[in-house]
């Protein structure tokens, strides 16, 4: 149902908003002001409540009008012949349900009525001539017009008895008399005919419009008067209540003042016996406000002032303003204090001297090298001046801000009789100690935590599909080539318990990422395809899990395929030490179908059972520690790191050290992309606020304050740089021959830029493993982010090839690369990168395919068509877009899709190409996630002959 605001209801019924709000509150509705909304039924209830009150007032006032209307109706009935039965039924007044008055509608009706009367008066002179002609008409026509007049009079009576709307139509008028002639008349001609009939027939009653208008105006004025009177009464009542509240507050203040006065008199009487015991006479009470004007005598000392009465009563030559200025002047203060520093004002009682609290010296003192005198004084609860004095007696000249060595501190503590102990220095930059030593955990606060489960297996065995089924999402559709290329962490809930899943890539290049996933996991789900069996990466995942000491749950996937053979998988895994519990082993085996959601619940129950056996615990009260799952550089947010909290609770604004970087947690999002303020153990979150992008696999720890975190992060970065410099191999006599031999080897210099840190590591490791005799790969630089001008400059200086993985160069970098003749290779699948570099090293690039960019277009608008897909309306900003070209969808300098065009149109026509500065529409095969401001890059692969 629709809602209405109270001020709209007030406007419709002609009441003030305040009255409507009060009436709504009296009806039990929950409203606050005139802007509150109510349902339509409640609005009708409010309007009807006002209408009921108005009807009662109007009934008494309009009794005379009703009597006059009844007399007119009787006269018309007597003089008018009886029309047809249908006309009588139509002309009867309709019983109208009493409504609330609408003054606006009444004013409009009166205006229309007055306009009609003026028009009728102007046409009377012209109508007199036509009246003589009408006397010769037939009796049937006269009867018909008499019926019209009777109907119009009845319509006027209905107009008097209900609010007029100005659009009332006399339907009965159309049913009587000559229908052919009446259809040609409009509303004005009918009114003129009715007026003429009134002139020709002397016996017909006339309507007194002036009397009726005066009655309406009087009724409206009475209503306005009632409203003004009610508002005046409300204002008077509010003033009375306000005055009453002020009087009550004043009475309460007077009562409190009287009680305070009585209390002071009682306390003064209680102190009189004590004062009488003293030898001095009782002094009169002195007004406190006058004490400020009394000034101390200017005697040289107290005795002299007491002996000499003239000097005691002598006024200062300075006026009161000068004395006040002397208080604000340091020079005058010093001068006057020298004269009368011992003199006290006789009117003020002496203030008691606060005694210094005595603090016991500590029995032991733990010091660190370089402590200052002020720090030592604060620790042993002594004044710095006292310690400086002791040091001076020992022959050491020091100030309170001067640092002391260990021997001096020990001698000082011996003088005080305190046992001094040197503080054991803890390397604050070493965050690895939190992962090896559990002594900082409180056993009373340790609670159960969610298990961290890593899904491992060979390429395309269904790892991401299984996780997709668990999360009811479509993660697998976003991976280029159908393989997962960087780790993802997600959390689901099963049977009231949370489970954290880590999805690792299965490709051989991502060995380090799989090892990293095994190091932070609690349970490993080894997924094996029932039709493929055990593959190389399956064996590698088994070795990683065994090295980490993690229990393994085997999920035999794709059992729905015709060639599935789970028994063969079980026997092959038994050869590698993975024995099923059915065969007497320790590993759980579950046959599933991730695609058709078969036995997924059984797999989750097995995970919870193994987690319960492992007894996974954590302390959520300590400062958080954990591991970096993934890190990347976002264009708008900066460094973004995906963290897995292992101990403690991570909060927003926590100072944190992540690997060799530091910062403060500015924002934190969970796996669903929602902002969170805290993350408990076993929870994956993405954070921002780091000064640099950390490395995937680094540990992180939260520090007490930002100063300590900054110091630890800078120290760790310094140590990492020093270690990198020490690893530089220097030429010696022993390796001289190897160095000369290496100089003959040709090198392929590459610069690697990728979207995430894990992809950078995997790509660099894969390229370095390529073994081609006489050629080796040299990774000059690797980083996260888009290809920029600095990368092009470095590539030109080192004669290197830039390899971009899921990133794009900036327009400035592309222009500089074209000018400097620097080659940029862009890829989205790691297979292609390895194959291309390997064949380049082997010299098997004949023929060679070179990418040629045809043009770029910007998406201006998108249109979603059912059963067709998403159509992107674009404008070509550079070059052209052809029908047979391949396209890349670039969003924030990151390639999100690479494919072919499904259609290319200019308006409604299919075209082969669209040139520069032209608009068109396109559809991309297998991709509907086109958004406004996406960049569409059209390119073709041209075959060139290697020279």
From Swiss-Prot:
Residues 482-486 are annotated as: G2. GTP binds at residues 457-464, 503-507, 557-560. Residues 448-617 form the tr-type G domain. Residues 457-464 are annotated as: G1. GO terms for cellular component: cytosol. Residues 76-90, 190-204, 316-334 have a biased composition (Low complexity). Residues 335-345 have a biased composition (Basic residues). Residues 557-560 are annotated as: G4. It is found in: Cytoplasm. Coiled coil: none annotated. Residues 55-361 are annotated as: Disordered. GO terms for molecular function: GTP binding; GTPase activity; translation initiation factor activity. Keywords: Cytoplasm, GTP-binding, Initiation factor, Nucleotide-binding, Protein biosynthesis. Its main location: cytoplasm. Residues 63-73, 103-116, 125-134, 170-183, 225-249, 257-267, 294-311 have a biased composition (Basic and acidic residues). Residues 593-595 are annotated as: G5. It holds the Pfam family IF-2. InterPro entries: EF-G-like_DII, IF2_II, IF2_N, P-loop_NTPase, Small_GTP-bd, T_Tr_GTP-bd_dom, TF_IF2_bacterial-like, TIF_IF2. One of the essential components for the initiation of protein synthesis. Protects formylmethionyl-tRNA from spontaneous hydrolysis and promotes its binding to the 30S ribosomal subunits. Also involved in the hydrolysis of GTP during the formation of the 70S ribosomal complex. Belongs to the TRAFAC class translation factor GTPase superfamily. Classic translation factor GTPase family. IF-2 subfamily. PANTHER family: TR-TYPE G DOMAIN-CONTAINING PROTEIN, TRANSLATION INITIATION FACTOR IF-2-RELATED. This is Translation initiation factor IF-2. It comes from Streptococcus equi subsp. zooepidemicus (strain MGCS10565). The lineage of its organism: Bacteria, Bacillati, Bacillota, Bacilli, Lactobacillales. The gene is infB.
């Amino acid at each position: 149902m629709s809602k209405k605001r109270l001020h709209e209801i007030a406007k419709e019924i002609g009441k003030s908003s305040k009255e409507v709000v009060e009436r709504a509150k009296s009806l039990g509705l929950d409203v606050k002001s005139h802007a509150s909304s109510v349902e339509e039924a409640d609005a009708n209830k409010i309007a009807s409540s006002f209408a009921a009150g108005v009807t009662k007032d109007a009934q008494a006032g309009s009794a005379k009008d009703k009597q006059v209307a009844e007399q007119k109706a009787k006269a018309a009935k007597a003089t008018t012949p009886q029309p047809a039965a249908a006309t009588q039924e139509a002309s009867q007044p309709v019983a109208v349900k009493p409504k609330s008055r609408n003054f606006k509608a009444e004013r409009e009706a009166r205006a229309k009525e007055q306009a009609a009367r003026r028009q009728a008066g102007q046409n009377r002179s012209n109508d007199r001539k036509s009246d003589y002609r009408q006397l010769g008409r037939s009796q049937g026509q006269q009867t018909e017009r008499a019926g019209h007049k009777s109907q119009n009079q009845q319509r006027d009576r209905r107009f008097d008895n209900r609010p007029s709307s100005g659009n009332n139509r006399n339907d009965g008028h159309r049913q009587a008399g000559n229908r052919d002639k009446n259809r040609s008349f409009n509303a004005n001609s009918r009114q003129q005919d009715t007026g003429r009939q009134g002139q020709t027939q002397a016996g017909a009653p006339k309507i007194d419009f002036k009397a009726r208008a005066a009655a309406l105006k009087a009724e409206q004025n009475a209503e306005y008067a009632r409203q003004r009177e009610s508002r005046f009464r409300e204002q008077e009542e509010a003033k009375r209540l306000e005055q009453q509240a002020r009087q009550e507050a004043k009475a309460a203040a007077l009562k409190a003042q009287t009680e305070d006065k009585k209390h002071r008199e009682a306390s003064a009487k209680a102190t009189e016996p004590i004062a009488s015991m003293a030898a001095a006479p009782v002094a009169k009470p002195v007004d406190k406000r006058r004490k400020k004007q009394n000034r101390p005598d200017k005697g040289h000392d107290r005795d002299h002032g007491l002996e000499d009465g003239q000097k005691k009563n002598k006024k200062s030559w300075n006026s009161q303003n000068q004395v006040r200025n002397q208080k604000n002047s340091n020079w005058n203060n010093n001068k006057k204090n020298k004269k009368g520093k011992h003199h006290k004002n006789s009117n003020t009682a002496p203030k008691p001297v606060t005694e210094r609290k005595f603090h016991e010296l500590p029995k032991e003192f733990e010091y660190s090298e370089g402590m200052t005198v002020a720090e030592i004084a604060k620790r042993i609860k002594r004044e710095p001046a006292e310690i400086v004095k002791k040091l001076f007696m020992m022959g050491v000249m020091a100030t309170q801000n001067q640092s002391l060595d260990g021997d001096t501190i020990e001698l000082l503590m011996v003088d005080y009789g305190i046992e001094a102990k040197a503080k054991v220095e803890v390397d604050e930059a070493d965050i690895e100690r939190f992962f090896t030593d559990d002594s900082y955990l409180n056993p009373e606060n340790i609670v159960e935590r969610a298990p961290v489960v890593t899904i491992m297996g060979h390429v395309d065995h269904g790892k991401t599909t299984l996780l997709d089924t668990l999360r009811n999402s479509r993660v697998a559709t976003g991976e280029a080539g159908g393989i997962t290329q960087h780790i993802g962490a997600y959390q689901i809930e099963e049977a009231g318990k949370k489970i954290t899943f880590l999805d690792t890539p299965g490709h051989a290049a991502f060995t380090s990422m799989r090892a990293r996933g095994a190091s932070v996991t609690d349970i490993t789900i080894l997924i094996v395809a029932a039709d493929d069996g055990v593959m190389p990466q399956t064996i590698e995942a088994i070795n990683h899990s065994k090295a980490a000491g993690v229990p393994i749950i085997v999920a035999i996937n794709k059992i729905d395929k015709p060639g599935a053979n789970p028994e063969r998988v079980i026997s092959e895994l038994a050869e590698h030490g993975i024995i099923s519990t059915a065969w007497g082993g320790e590993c759980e085996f579950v046959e599933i179908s991730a695609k058709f959601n078969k036995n997924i619940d059984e797999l989750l129950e097995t995970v919870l059972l193994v987690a319960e056996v492992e007894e996974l615990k954590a302390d959520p009260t300590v400062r958080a520690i954990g591991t970096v799952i993934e890190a990347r550089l976002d264009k708008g947010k900066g460094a973004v790191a995906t963290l897995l909290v292992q101990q403690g609770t991570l909060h927003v604004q926590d100072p944190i050290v992540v690997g060799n970087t530091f910062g403060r947690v500015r924002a934190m999002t969970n796996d669903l992309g929602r902002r969170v303020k805290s993350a408990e153990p076993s929870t994956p979150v993405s954070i921002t606020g780091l000064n640099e992008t950390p490395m995937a696999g680094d540990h992180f720890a939260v520090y007490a304050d930002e100063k300590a975190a900054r110091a630890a992060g800078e120290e760790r970065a310094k140590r990492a740089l020093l270690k990198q410099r020490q690893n530089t191999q220097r030429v010696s006599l022993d390796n001289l021959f190897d160095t000369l031999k290496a100089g003959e080897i040709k090198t392929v210099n590459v610069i690697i830029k990728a979207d995430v840190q894990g992809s950078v590591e995997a790509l660099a490791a894969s390229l370095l493993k390529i073994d081609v005799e006489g050629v080796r790969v040299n990774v000059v630089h690797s980083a996260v982010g888009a290809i920029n001008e600095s990368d092009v400059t470095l590539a030109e200086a080192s004669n290197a090839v830039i390899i971009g993985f899921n990133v794009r160069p900036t327009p400035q970098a592309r222009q500089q690369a074209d000018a400097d003749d620097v080659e940029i290779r862009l890829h989205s699948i790691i297979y292609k990168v390895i194959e291309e570099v390997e064949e380049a090293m082997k010299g098997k690039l004949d023929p060679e395919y070179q990418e040629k960019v045809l043009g770029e277009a910007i998406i201006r608008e998108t249109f979603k068509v059912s059963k067709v897909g998403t159509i992107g309306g674009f404008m070509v900003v550079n070059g052209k877009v052809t029908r047979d070209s391949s396209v890349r969808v670039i969003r924030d300098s990151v390639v999100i899709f690479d494919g072919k065009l499904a259609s290319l149109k200019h308006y409604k026509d299919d075209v082969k190409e669209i040139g520069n500065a032209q608009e068109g529409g396109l559809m991309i095969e297998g991709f509907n996630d086109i958004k406004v401001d996406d960049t569409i890059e059209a390119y073709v692969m041209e075959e060139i002959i290697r020279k």
